[in-house]
């Protein structure tokens, strides 16, 4: 707290504190890079739609700002999440008496919520960026099946067309991409559902 009061940065938590309050940054995650005296800062801009426009200016401005706050000998690397397209398809049967289109919208919203890397800590109501967390299809499916009005739900496809090691930027989604699908959290997705009423 004393360091933060002086508006200086030494630990990853200090860099996160300064990055999160920087204009244009919605949330950041900061970590030490193993074996070096460097801080790796990943940021998500405010009101980001997945496009790359404006990234360079924000990265440069934040890097310059953090360079004035770091101690001598520390390297600051500011980067962005990597976007990776994902395709989710499912079959859905709505219970009688429920609007199947509204149930479908609720399902799509739940998928987006589960795969979104921007998370809120329930106790503190503070946002954080979850990068590198495991994604479990069963976990997502259980959350969706709890939605009111669902009689049957099954994911038929959950994949990406991008080969491992070739991260891309997409206007639809953002994710920190690691080598395995199971270690990726997605922001948005291409979702298609086949829906019927019971």
Name the predicted role of every residue range:
Residues 2, 6-133, 195-198:
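Carbohydrate-recognition loop of C-type lectin domains
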Residues 81, 124-127, 153-198:
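Immediate N-terminus of the mature polypeptide
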Residues 111-166:
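C-terminal structured "cap/appendage" subdomains that terminate the fold
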């Amino acid at each position: 707290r004393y360091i933060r009061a002086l508006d200086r940065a030494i630990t990853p938590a200090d860099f996160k504190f300064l990055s999160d309050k920087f204009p244009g940054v919605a949330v950041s995650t900061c970590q030490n890079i193993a074996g070096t005296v460097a801080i790796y800062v990943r940021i998500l801009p405010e009101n980001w739609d997945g496009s790359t426009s404006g990234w360079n200016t924000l990265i440069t401005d934040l890097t310059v700002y953090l360079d004035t706050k770091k101690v001598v000998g520390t390297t600051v690397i500011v980067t962005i999440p990597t976007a990776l397209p994902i395709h989710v398809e499912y079959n859905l049967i709505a219970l009688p008496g429920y609007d199947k289109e509204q149930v479908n919208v609720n399902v799509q919203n739940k998928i987006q919520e589960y795969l979104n890397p921007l998370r809120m800590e329930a106790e503190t109501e503070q946002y954080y960026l979850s990068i590198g967390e495991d994604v479990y299809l069963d976990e997502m499916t259980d959350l969706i099946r709890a939605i009111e009005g669902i009689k049957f739900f099954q994911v038929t496809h959950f994949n990406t067309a991008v080969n491992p090691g070739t991260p891309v930027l997409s206007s639809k989604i953002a994710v920190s991409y690691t080598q395995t699908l199971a270690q990726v959290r997605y922001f948005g997705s291409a979702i298609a559902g086949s829906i019927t009423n019971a």
